[in-house]
């Protein structure tokens, strides 16, 4: 196939990562990046998720001035500070989470949306601080909070500083929930590592997208550690639902309506 034809095809069609059918780009975006054939939910950018659940022109971003430093002077294949700059340029984001307030079908809420495209959605000190401040803002203003997780876990380039964010966010959520305020946690694929082991699983209501990968360590690591074969659906949203760790699996098309229903019932 000529290169020009391949390029034109890539602009017009999207191949499903699950069932391999070709989806027209029109249908792909019409269905909110969900395969119309097999219901596979493609990853979304944080800005797309905000546009998907927040009422038009109601989004007010908060804490955009918080950026990660490099206190450890960490360097693997390249310096951490260089890696941050590259991800900022590629994604147009300052960090792996967007935080702010907005309305969901006319109900005000604080919202944090993680973005896997920024360093695998990893949680460093800036991500932890942004979410913590948003939780504290919600507590002060008596607002419900919605957090959409998409993360590989704690950011290794920040060492213990990234791990302490797990406890910091969890403590802030405890103060919010002790005031009777609502926290809705939404698990998208993947939600793993330190994010899974902390705030993602602390919601009063925990929702998940269909077939989302949710768990702590990778399946292969767990199998090698335990020397046992795990169930085929292990670390899936459906497995967690069957075992009581998730309250509801919600298709993307129904997500805003479902969040609004829960917020309305709580109000």
From Swiss-Prot:
Q: Which UniProt keywords apply?
A: ATP-binding, Chloroplast, Fatty acid biosynthesis, Fatty acid metabolism, Lipid biosynthesis, Lipid metabolism, Metal-binding, Nucleotide-binding, Plastid, Transferase, Zinc, Zinc-finger
Cellular component per GO? acetyl-CoA carboxylase complex; chloroplast stroma
Gene Ontology biological-process annotations? fatty acid biosynthetic process; malonyl-CoA biosynthetic process
The record's cofactor note says: Binds 1 zinc ion per subunit.
Q: Which cofactor does it need?
A: Zn(2+)
> In which compartments does the protein localize?
Plastid, Chloroplast stroma
| Statement: the UniProt record of this protein carries the keyword NADP | no
Q: What class of enzyme is it?
A: transferase
Residues covered by the CoA carboxyltransferase N-terminal domain: 12-267
The positions annotated for binding Zn(2+) are 16, 19, 35, 38
**Classification via InterPro entries:** AcCoA_carboxyl_beta, Acetyl_CoA_COase_Trfase_b_su, ClpP/crotonase-like_dom_sf, COA_CT_N
Which parts of the sequence are C4-type zinc fingers?
A: 16-38
Catalytic activity reported: N(6)-carboxybiotinyl-L-lysyl-[protein] + acetyl-CoA = N(6)-biotinyl-L-lysyl-[protein] + malonyl-CoA
Molecular function terms, GO-annotated: acetyl-CoA carboxylase activity; ATP binding; carboxyl- or carbamoyltransferase activity; zinc ion binding
What Pfam family is a match, any one? Answer: Carboxyl_trans
Pathway annotation: Lipid metabolism; malonyl-CoA biosynthesis; malonyl-CoA from acetyl-CoA: step 1/1
Superkingdom classification of source: Eukaryota
Role played: Component of the acetyl coenzyme A carboxylase (ACC) complex. Biotin carboxylase (BC) catalyzes the carboxylation of biotin on its carrier protein (BCCP) and then the CO(2) group is transferred by the transcarboxylase to acetyl-CoA to form malonyl-CoA.
Q: Which family does it belong to?
A: Belongs to the AccD/PCCB family.
Give the HAMAP family listed for this entry: AcetylCoA_CT_beta
Q: What is this protein called?
A: Acetyl-coenzyme A carboxylase carboxyl transferase subunit beta, chloroplastic
Recorded name of the encoding gene: accD
């Amino acid at each position: 196939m000529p290169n020009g034809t391949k390029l034109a095809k890539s602009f017009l069609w999207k191949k499903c990562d699950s069932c391999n059918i070709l989806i027209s780009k029109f249908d792909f975006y019409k269905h909110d990046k969900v395969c119309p054939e097999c219901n596979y939910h493609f990853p979304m950018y944080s800005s797309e998720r905000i546009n998907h659940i927040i009422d038009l022109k109601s989004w007010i971003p908060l804490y955009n001035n918080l950026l990660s430093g490099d206190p450890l002077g960490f360097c693997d294949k390249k310096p951490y500070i260089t890696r941050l700059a590259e991800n900022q340029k590629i994604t147009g984001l300052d960090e792996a989470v967007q935080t702010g307030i907005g309305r969901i079908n006319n109900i005000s809420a604080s919202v944090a949306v993680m973005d896997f495209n920024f360093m695998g959605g990893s949680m460093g000190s800036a991500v932890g601080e942004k979410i913590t401040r948003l939780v504290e803002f919600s507590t002060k203003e008596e607002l419900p909070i919605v957090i959409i997780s998409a993360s590989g876990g704690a950011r290794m380039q920040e060492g213990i500083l990234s791990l302490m964010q797990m406890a910091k966010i969890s403590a802030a959520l405890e103060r919010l929930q002790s005031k009777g305020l609502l926290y809705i946690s939404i698990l998208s694929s993947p939600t793993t590592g330190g994010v899974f082991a902390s705030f993602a699983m602390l919601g009063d209501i925990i929702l998940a997208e269909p077939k989302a990968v949710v768990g702590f360590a990778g399946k292969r690591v767990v199998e090698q550690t335990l020397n046992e074969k795990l169930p085929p659906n292990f670390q899936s949203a459906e497995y967690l639902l069957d075992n009581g760790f998730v309250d509801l699996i919600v298709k993307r098309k129904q997500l805003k309506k479902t969040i609004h229903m829960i917020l309305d019932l709580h109000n």
